[in-house]
Design a protein with these regions (language model features):
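A short, N-terminal "cap"/entry segment at the start of jelly-roll beta-barrel domains
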Residues: 1-40, 50, 119
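Short beta-strand/loop turn elements enriched in aromatics
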Residues: 35, 45-55, 111
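Short hydrophobic/aromatic-rich beta-strand segments that constitute the beta-sheet cores
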Residues: 40, 69, 102-104
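A cytosolic small-molecule/anion-sensing beta-strand core signal
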Residues: 63-64, 80, 98
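Short acidic-glycine-tyrosine-enriched beta hairpin
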Residues: 73-88
Length: 119
């Protein structure tokens, strides 16, 4: 597979670009009843995200390509099928090679849909 299935890419769930922390991403989000979120991101180009932190844990699963979790000077490369948990409050950012797809689970609301963005 080179992309997520169409049913996972409903335009109503498209993540607004201000939630991406990295240019060139295409993302979709689903919400849990407890306020958690699952996000699916694909990118066509290489990129490095902005450093940030969350008030909740983040789980990352690399599906395709390579995603590198960066925490301070530590770099954790994730190949397809590899996963990592970023504890809440930890400053981090990610790096992607072209064609990378990832799934992220957040213990709180992280992503804003295009339809929710108030600019």
């Amino acid at each position: 597979m080179n992309d997520f299935p169409e049913f996972m890419k409903n335009p109503k769930n498209r993540i607004h670009s201000t939630s991406d922390y990295m240019a060139g991403l295409e993302g979709y989000v689903f919400d849990g009843a407890d306020g958690s979120q699952i996000a699916f991101w694909s990118n066509r180009n290489a990129g490095t995200g902005a450093e940030h932190k969350h008030p909740y844990d983040e789980y990352v699963l690399a599906v395709e390509g390579k995603f590198t979790v960066c925490i301070g000077s530590k770099r954790i490369p994730l190949a397809p099928g590899e996963e990592y948990v970023i504890p809440k409050g930890v400053l981090h950012f990610g790096e992607r090679i072209p064609g990378t797809r990832t799934i992220h689970a957040f213990g709180g609301k992280r992503a804003v849909r295009e339809s929710e963005f108030k600019g």
